[in-house]
């Protein structure tokens, strides 16, 4: 229950409103189409979607190529597989690039690593508006199901909201997941005045204005 509550809370904080093959409804909502039957097709469709819809930060061809690659779902295939695989899910407003270091390390140890891109991320902030928690659940469900059929032992990993999503999947699909690799899991809000966030948001967007780090904004 706390996992689903965490995902719902993330959706509300971002003002996100609100299964099979890629649908016309997805296109009408301006959400990255899902429903692919392989990781390769999913990654190819994501590349086409990001290329057509991203507001690029860098203004050179090389820079845009670097931006595109940073936001793509990726597969890190080990030279010598030991039969294990892991699906890594990033947090809100982030990208698969956040796992680039750990993914290479895991692959070097014989693990097949795949990352996903949450719908609404990777293009421009406005694209978070039509995306829903169900869209995020769906991409995890689809790609975890695909991975589980291709490896002997499936692990799931996440950062922040990504942790909620993989735990939610495991709760809904008992027995499929061997274990978890979780970074900063967002499963409980402990500050005593967190309940007031929805009220305060009527008067100001931020308690502390966030720092805009242009040096890394290209990778998310």
What are these regions (language model features)?
Residues 24, 28-67, 185-220:
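The alpha/beta-hydrolase serine catalytic core
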Residues 168-172:
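Active-site signature of alpha/beta-hydrolase-fold catalytic machinery across serine-
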